[in-house]
Curated annotation (Swiss-Prot):
Gene, per the UniProt record: acsA2
Any one of the GO BP annotations: acetyl-CoA biosynthetic process from acetate
Membership in a protein family: Belongs to the ATP-dependent AMP-binding enzyme family.
Protein name: Acetyl-coenzyme A synthetase 2
GO cellular component: cytosol
Origin species: Pseudomonas aeruginosa (strain ATCC 15692 / DSM 22644 / CIP 104116 / JCM 14847 / LMG 12228 / 1C / PRS 101 / PAO1)
Length: 645
């Protein structure tokens, strides 16, 4: 057992930080006792409004209803760019570091404004209007941020699709959001490899006849398919466009973006976030969680295809007039010192990454870290999944040299911004704990009957009051949002995560309690993977569960039952893995695929995934009650054949 130590707030950190523990306690109390007063003050302090709101909040969590800053009008791009121009027009807004260490760029706020306005005018010239959906399928290059902000500027709703998703996944997201415009690049570059983005778009669009415009950024100058009249080059269109584009006044509750996340029922959910509340959540958490001060260089290593990239590469930092770093590459290319080299090269002060990356780099040993200085670092963050105490301590002692507090943040695509987190100047740290709630956030633990657990204990993590950046809908299927997040425990937001609360009130996230696997910080629905596997003619049935993985946090373990007449083989296994890669993306390929003559089912035909989870995790002494199975003998057969031995 790893002994948990407590790390008090260092004096130097407390003296520099915006908030100490007394400040936290006072503001937190105000935020839950007088939420309208608190959030009204914050919205005025953090955002510029074209028109004031007439009510801070109203809604009913039992019905999943939340309206924030009703009547207020603002524009996200204006808040992220225009209002900074007078004071910091020549300040660097985006530092871009390419996949190849020889490539980098610095974009000032003035240049950002220029490019965003021109791209916004290009979109308008192609018929994009307020409320239209635009799909962005891009590598990690500055143009991805320009595209998001250009949409926000004219009131279009962007749907960013991670560049690692397959053409089929891209197609499904374009169709679900009814996008008529796609912004992409010829190719992406990642870890020295080229990703055929435009080719993938072409495959996806075979089934998307309504797409009338594809804007293509030239990244590699590789050969790509081209449809005359529909496809336009980004650089040519920008050159011809005006740099004058007024920011559209948007209602606080107007949609800002749709972002697809895995669901336990198979079909990805288009999480809808709105303008005012979302931007306030992103800006406020960015400032206080990362203690961002003028002049700091801030680096979040996420991809903009995930919510972390939305909130903590683009919207939160830019709303605060920050310098934010965008990285095209991967942690181990050209070698395992790359992250630390980038930190030295750009004098990064605040670094935010995922436990998966930390664990992978920890396995490479201390030498790649020690060969760099990292003296600029002040704070280290963790996001995407719980960080195990061993990785936490390595991150703290080796990477941060015991100088840098670790900000272990818990939040989700649906929450829009960080909900449970330490604050650098206020929170003593415990390795592996996300510690305490952010302002206005009221977490509770619920038992199996849905009753709140008092004091220390373990249960389902839920939130019992609305917060500004919460999900507003699932695009095109509002009932699904209610059924998923608000129906399981009426009066609460159901997170899908389990948690433990210790005697100090600190929260420890214990992992998913629903059928979603967290692989390297990517949420993958088990039903999505199962659906992909059963597309193969040889597969009769598939059941997918998660099991522990030293680096990725969780691995995907698939049990596959074949059709009569089909035989297990290495070739078939490779076909199935390729099929999952094609349908979802290579990151969703099972790590283990076990042939299962039959699966453990109840008499009503329900697969007992609990038992499969135990087999996958090799927890064979705690299988629990198998008497309700239609054929209990199935279990021993699966145990005997675990990992196809």
């Amino acid at each position: 057992m790893f002994e948990i130590s407590v790390h008090p707030v260092p004096d130097a950190v407390r003296q520099r930080a915006y908030l100490n523990d007394d400040d936290y306690q006072r503001l937190y109390r105000q935020s839950v006792e007088n939420p309208d007063e608190f959030w009204g003050e914050q919205a005025k302090a953090f955002l510029d409004w074209f028109k004031p709101w007439h009510s801070v909040h109203h809604g009913d969590l039992r019905k999943g209803q939340a309206t924030w800053f009703k009547g207020g009008q603002l524009n996200v791009a204006y808040n992220c760019i225009d209002r900074h121009l007078e004071r910091r027009g020549e300040q660097i807004a985006i530092v871009w570091e390419g996949d190849n260490p020889s490539e980098s760029a610095h974009i000032t706020y003035r240049k950002l404004h220029h490019n965003v306005c021109r791209l916004a005018n290009v979109l308008k010239s192609r018929g994009v209007e307020k409320g239209d959906r635009v799909c962005i399928y891009m590598p990690m290059i500055p143009e991805a941020a320009y595209a998001m902000l250009a949409c926000a500027r004219i009131g279009a709703v962007h749907s960013v699709v991670f560049g690692g998703f397959s053409p089929d996944s891209l197609r499904d997201r374009i169709l679900d959001a009814d996008c008529r415009t796609v912004i992409t690049a010829d190719e992406g570059v990642r870890g020295g490899k080229y990703i055929p983005l435009k080719q993938n778009v072409e495959k996806a669009l075979k089934d998307c006849p309504d797409v009338s415009t594809v804007v293509v950024v030239e990244r590699t100058q590789g050969d790509i398919p081209w449809v005359e009249g529909r496809d336009i080059w980004y650089h040519e269109a920008l050159h011809a466009a005006s740099a004058d584009c007024p920011a559209e006044a948007m209602d606080a509750e107007d949609p800002l973006f749709i972002l697809y996340t895995s669901g336990s029922t198979g079909k990805p959910k288009g999480v809808l976030h709105t303008t005012g509340g979302y931007l306030l959540g992103a800006a406020m958490t960015h400032k206080y969680v990362f203690d961002y001060h003028d002049g700091d260089v801030y680096w979040c290593t996420a991809d903009v295809g995930w919510v972390t990239g939305h909130s903590y590469i683009v919207y939160g930092p830019l709303a605060n007039g920050a310098t934010t770093l965008m990285f095209e590459g991967v942690p181990n290319y050209p070698d395992a010192s790359r992250f630390w080299q980038v930190i030295d090269k750009h004098q990064v002060n605040i670094f935010y990454t995922a436990p998966t990356a930390i664990r992978a780099l920890m396995r490479e040993g201390d030498a790649p870290v020690r060969q760099t200085s990292r003296s600029s670092l002040r704070l280290l963050g963790s996001v995407g999944e719980p960080i195990n105490p061993e990785a936490w301590e390595w991150y703290y002692q080796v990477v941060g040299e015991k100088r840098c507090p670790i900000l272990d943040t818990w939040w989700q695509t649906e929450t829009g911004s960080i909900l449970i987190t330490p604050l650098p100047g206020a929170t003593a740290l415990k390795p592996g704990s996300a510690t305490r709630p952010f302002f206005g956030v009221q977490p509770v633990l619920l038992d199996e009957k849905g009753k709140e657990i008092d004091g220390a204990g373990s249960g389902v993590l839920a939130i019992k009051a609305s917060w500004p950046s919460q999900i507003r809908s699932v695009y095109g299927d509002h009932q699904r949002m209610i059924d998923t997040y608000f129906k399981p425990y009426p009066g609460y937001y159901f997170s899908g995560d389990g948690a433990r609360r210790d005697e100090d009130g600190y929260y420890w996230i214990t992992g998913r309690v629903d059928d979603v696997i967290n692989v390297s910080g990517h949420r993958i629905g088990t039903a999505e993977v199962e659906s992909a596997l059963v597309l193969h003619d040889a597969v009769a049935e598939a059941a997918v569960v998660g099991c522990p993985h030293d680096v990725k946090g969780q691995a995907i373990y698939a049990f596959v039952t074949l059709m009569a007449g089909s035989q297990p083989s290495e070739a078939l296994q490779q076909e199935l893995l390729a099929l999952v890669g094609k349908e979802i993306g290579s990151f969703a390929k099972p790590d283990h695929l076990q042939w299962a003559p039959s699966l453990p089912k109840t008499r009503s035909g329900k697969i007992m995934r609990r038992i499969l989870r135990k087999i996958a995790c090799n927890e064979l002494d705690s299988l629990g009650d198998t008497s309700t199975l239609a054929d209990p003998g199935v279990v021993q057969g699966l145990i005997d054949n675990r990992l196809n031995r």
